[in-house]
Amino acid sequence: MSLNFLDFEQPIAELEAKIDSLTAVSRQDEKLDINIDEEVHRLREKSVELTRKIFADLGAWQVAQLARHPQRPYTLDYVRLAFDEFDELAGDRAYADDKAIVGGIARLDGRPVMIIGHQKGRETKEKIRRNFGMPAPEGYRKALRLMEMAERFNMPIITFIDTPGAYPGVGAEERGQSEAIARNLREMSRLSVPVICTVIGEGGSGGALAIGVGDKVNMLQYSTYSVISPEGCASILWKSADKAPLAAEAMGIIAPRLKELKLIDSIIQEPLGGAHRNPEAMAASLKAQLLADLADLDVLSKDDLKNRRYQRLMSYGYA
């Protein structure tokens, strides 16, 4: 897969272009008198070191760009890589099947679990079909239906958060967007089965929180979680989206800051360069964290789970 490089990764992109060029020359003419393998190896090492140096000092805006990377793994990628026997379940049994939310039953290391997550889509047609990962009310009602099913069958719930926010269209508002989100918050706080939530990309406002009330809340290293996008915040405060980098720093949208504020429990480290560089390794780390979280929650009673989760939700907004 050819990598898409972000603006701040251009020095890495230039090195990788040199490596690709040398590799192509080597393949085209195997009778070259010169051995370029050593030079390719040297450039690869230099690329790794440069990547390590750049990623050691990322700002919040750069992390926000990584969270939106077009090649970043989405919910269905992690379902394929970390789970077995996934059976997707569709529809809210009231209006429609919202493709921006996917969900179904799968096995995690042999154990049945209910998976629910946002799905953005990659190609243009799929992005439109998934509404760019912005759910309508029927998406959140589908999610709630699956959560209630999981409770009936005593299955842990695992959610993957990756959305710029709930869809703000007129039709969505007419069908009760705010009510659907609010109902999910209330009902998730009352579930008697373990709930583990992981932000895998963008965690945008109520659209993220509507499937984000859990006993354990994790974030991938280069994901974000905020009440509004940096561009939206900048447009309100400075009347210009160009101030988005400044807004991103001020909002505290990155995982270390959110863990410091006790809004999340764990930060799952990503492969060097981000999850899109090695989805398989990222899925393995994510799976290990989910299994560890389930082991911690299995020893708690149903009442303890509900009480702890409710108190956690009520603590949001307090320093």
From Swiss-Prot:
Q: Which UniProt keywords apply?
A: ATP-binding, Cytoplasm, Fatty acid biosynthesis, Fatty acid metabolism, Lipid biosynthesis, Lipid metabolism, Nucleotide-binding, Transferase
Q: Where is the CoA carboxyltransferase C-terminal domain?
A: 35-296
Give GO terms for biological process: fatty acid biosynthetic process; malonyl-CoA biosynthetic process
Q: Identify the metabolic or biological route this protein is part of.
A: Lipid metabolism; malonyl-CoA biosynthesis; malonyl-CoA from acetyl-CoA: step 1/1
Q: What does this protein do?
A: Component of the acetyl coenzyme A carboxylase (ACC) complex. First, biotin carboxylase catalyzes the carboxylation of biotin on its carrier protein (BCCP) and then the CO(2) group is transferred by the carboxyltransferase to acetyl-CoA to form malonyl-CoA.
What subunit structure does UniProt give? Acetyl-CoA carboxylase is a heterohexamer composed of biotin carboxyl carrier protein (AccB), biotin carboxylase (AccC) and two subunits each of ACCase subunit alpha (AccA) and ACCase subunit beta (AccD).
Q: What is this protein called?
A: Acetyl-coenzyme A carboxylase carboxyl transferase subunit alpha
What organism is this sequence from?
Citrobacter koseri (strain ATCC BAA-895 / CDC 4225-83 / SGSC4696)
